[in-house]
UniProtKB/Swiss-Prot annotation:
SUPFAM superfamilies: Ribosomal protein L36 (SSF57840). This is Large ribosomal subunit protein bL36. The keyword Cell cycle does not apply. The keyword Chaperone does not apply. GO terms for molecular function: structural constituent of ribosome. PROSITE patterns: RIBOSOMAL_L36. Keywords: Ribonucleoprotein, Ribosomal protein. One of its GO terms (biological process) is translation. Coiled coil: none annotated. The gene is rpmJ.
Length: 37
C-alpha cells in the first residue's frame, strides 16, 4: 500500500474507488495498491 498525495492508475486493471471519503486504487497487482493521505 502506497500513501501519496496524488493517486493514479498504474495499469489497466487498476480501479479508483472512494471509501469513507478516502480515494483508493485497488488492483490485481498488490504493488499498485494506493491511497490518498
Amino acid at each position: 500500500m502506497k500513501v501519496r498525495p496524488s493517486v493514479k492508475k498504474m495499469c489497466d486493471k487498476c480501479k479508483i474507488i472512494k471509501r469513507r471519503g478516502v480515494i483508493r486504487v485497488i488492483c490485481a497487482t498488490p504493488k499498485h495498491k494506493q491511497r490518498q493521505g
